[in-house]
Amino acid sequence: MSREGWIGIFLITILMFLWTLWLAHSARPQTPQKENPVPTDSIEKTTPATEDRPEQALDIGPYARFIGLPESVLVVQTPLYRAFFRTTGAALMSLELTRYQDASGKPVTLWDERQKSELTFAEGRYLIPLHKLSFEVTYLPKTPIEKAPDSAVFRLTLAKDTFIQVVYRFQPEDYHIEREIIFQNFNDRLRNPYLVHHVIIETPQTERSASLMQPYTALYYRQGEDVDYLQPDEDEKIEKTFQGNIYWISAKGHFFTQLFRNDAGYSAVTLRSLPFSKGELPKYEITLQLPMEEGRLRESLYLGPLRYTYLKKYGRDYEKQLNLGWSFIRYINTGFIIPVFQVLEKYIPSYGIIIAILALLVKILLSPLTWQSYLAGARMQVINELPEVKALDEKYKDDPNKLMMEKSLLYRELGVNPLSGCIPLLLQMPLFFAMVSFFPSAFELRQESFLWAKDLSTYDDLIRWGFHIPILGEHISLFALMTALTTLAYTLLSPQSTSTTTPGMKWLPYLTPVIFFLFLNSYSAALSWYYTVLNILTITQTLIMRRMVDKEAIIQKLRQRRQKRSNAGVMRQSVPRWLRQAGKRR
């Protein structure tokens, strides 16, 4: 290929590299009518009131007697999670997912003592901290909840018919926990028709490295019909305030999220991302104003995986938290790649094989473009071997501008475009970007092993050492190395590489695999495996096409074209003016 062609390929590679770096940093339910007695086996432990608790000094009027009472911890279990609730504040204490493990093999914990949830409301002159008041358990479901929805009910009784009731509703196969707070017979006692929910969230480390998780963390929110996000910053506090029209807020991790939702819309929201150190995960402060209607308010909490199929079924734009690329790229992922995965995973247990089949399907779809690109490269190889071209190289070896102009004239006489081989590559770039976006965000690949890789969602590190090497890191990914080697093999095999006559451009075929290796070395092993398979298929395809291409027929066809376009005056006028002027200046 000509120098211009190799420059085009090199720039495409650099663009892919820079883009991926940037990407790494972008009906009311019924309340239970019957209150069953609480089964004692659901009460895990009881803790006495702490002595000299400062809450006892709070000026909260008639609610002071509900401070500092003994606390019970209750357990609710479904097929998806195990949740612990405390009677103090009728609050969620911790939640662990039973189907997923963290890097140490323990259940993924998405809520624990590091997370804080504080509810306050105003009554008369008092500001009441609901999260510090002691409730009684009036109904607790028999667990595990496996067949039908069920509820847990907590109550704080002020008078015979005046009470605060907190109801949690659970579904057997749903990661949502719905909470309803009822102020019964409060009439005009509440100063404001809302509660304030203040939340402090520390992003839980669910994967093996916090530094690898950090680029995928953000605070997402849905405002009206749009989903946007607040990107945390290591060095400064970031704050956003909204008035109404916010329907959910999500502290997104890499593969799991903690999401709060109010279908009526939060009447006011403040989001804060706090500074954090390198190698740590972000910490957020969220203040939500929950509107109350007829003494009732509702809020849902989603603590679960960021799997596209789960998020999409809720119909609330949860899936827009997943970084699947820009609008057009996203359509490729949601319209082609994800559906293919959904179909294949029903029949094939190995995701490594699924990825290989996906590469085969992509190669079949791109075969027409690959054929056109190969033909263009073969034509340029034949042209560069013509005596006329070699004579031009020798005649103008000291005058590159003149050589460029004369070659451009010759190419036009032959009816070829030296950059035509790059056009099919450009058309394939959206698919490349889609794959780069999809694989690191694909929950399906999390902790899925293949060959020597223990987790396809991150890099494989079979070869590693105990110190950091700049750019390379502390390991070598064998999948990334395979991608680099197969890329080099394909590049050297293609006709473009053999047609590079400019001495300064001959290093480009070797630089491209190096760039790919350095990037993929700390990237998803699934992406490296995908491109390894794709390269092997491309090499096989190239060997087949090489047998199909007749160089003598190409030469004959080129000479026929030249004969038809033999008017040199016209051809010389067709040379770009800037190129002719450059030749004259020399």
Describe each model-derived feature in a short phrase.
Residues 1, 41, 143-146:
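Aromatic/His-enriched, Gly/Pro-containing loop or helix-boundary segments
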Residues 12, 25-104, 110, 114, ...:
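Juxtamembrane extramembrane loops of integral membrane proteins
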Residues 57-60, 66-69, 93, 151-153, ...:
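Short secondary-structure boundary micro-motifs
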Residues 1-39, 85, 181, 200-213, ...:
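Helix-loop-helix
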Residues 46-53, 58-61, 143-149, 160, ...:
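Generic detector of short, locally flexible boundary/turn motifs and exposed helical patches
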Residues 66, 73, 237, 241, ...:
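Hydrophobic alpha-helical segments with strong N-terminal bias
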Residues 73-321:
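Soluble non-transmembrane domains of integral membrane proteins
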